[in-house]
From Swiss-Prot:
UniProt gene name: slmA
Coiled-coil ranges per UniProt: 110-130
Subcellular location: Cytoplasm, Nucleoid
The entry's keywords: Cell cycle, Cell division, Coiled coil, Cytoplasm, DNA-binding
Pfam family, one: SlmA-like_C
Origin superkingdom: Bacteria
Assembly and oligomerization: Homodimer. Interacts with FtsZ.
Family the UniProt entry places it in: Belongs to the nucleoid occlusion factor SlmA family.
InterPro entries: Homeodomain-like_sf (IPR009057), HTH-type_Tx_Regulator (IPR050624), HTH_TetR (IPR001647), NO_SlmA (IPR023769), SlmA-like_C (IPR054580)
GO biological process, one term: negative regulation of division septum assembly
GO (cellular component) term, any one: bacterial nucleoid
Alphabetized PANTHER family for the sequence: ACREF/ENVCD OPERON REPRESSOR-RELATED, ACREF_ENVCD OPERON REPRESSOR-RELATED
Protein name: Nucleoid occlusion factor SlmA
DNA-binding region: 30-49
Length: 197
């Protein structure tokens, strides 16, 4: 008799939570609703996660691992400043588009009314991404001998705000307005402006 593959219950709970965030935009996810979606009791949920905040932390850990590991690959493999910036922004937008429910965590929508430390972790994640972008922009001077007329920190903040805005539009439109829509044309314009500065 063949054994059915063992389900990793923690991962299954997180997948269901992400799915509920996608299919129930604007609604608060309760542990009772999540337990029903997973097909277990609330007590069973708490055997895997001591609190709902820990469930959201599990999603945030997935976000951090996925984005930061890929960001490090971009930093290692690509040396051109503009291409690096483009790839970092594209990474954020594609990740958001492929994970609509998780986009609600990224923009803070799903964290309203939840533990403050969850929003703080997302803030820290975006601060790390902004630091990477700032580093990319600062390395332009070292690599090419030419910098920008505007402080790199200001430019990094502008680029990250662009990506965050696209993610927010995606969430606000209930996942209809794709973050990557018109990205190539928008990036061409942004790049032209950056190279002028």
């Amino acid at each position: 008799m063949a054994e059915s593959p063992k389900i990793n219950r923690r991962e299954h709970i997180l997948q269901c939570l992400a799915q509920m965030l996608e299919t129930s935009p604007g609604q608060r996810i309760t542990t009772a609703k999540l337990a029903a979606e997973v097909g277990v009791s609330e007590a069973a949920l708490y055997r895997h996660f001591p609190s709902k905040a820990r469930m959201f932390e599990g999603l945030i850990e997935f976000i951090e691992d996925a984005i930061l590991s890929r960001l490090n690959i971009i930093m290692d493999e690509e040396k051109d400043t503009m291409t690096r910036c483009q790839l970092v922004l594209h990474l954020l937008l594609v990740f958001s588009e492929r994970n609509p429910g998780i986009s609600r965590v990224l923009n803070g929508d799903a964290l309203l009314g939840e533990n403050e430390r969850l929003r703080s972790r997302i803030d820290v994640l975006f601060a790390k991404i902004e630091t990477h972008i700032k580093q990319i922009l600062r390395e332009k001077t070292l690599r090419e001998g030419v910098g920008f007329n505007i402080d790199e920190a200001i430019l990094a903040n502008l680029l990250l705000a662009f990506a965050e805005g696209r993610i927010s539009q995606f969430v606000r439109s209930e996942f209809k307005q794709k973050p990557t829509q018109h990205f190539d044309e928008q990036w061409t314009f942004i790049q032209q402006q950056l190279l002028r500065s």
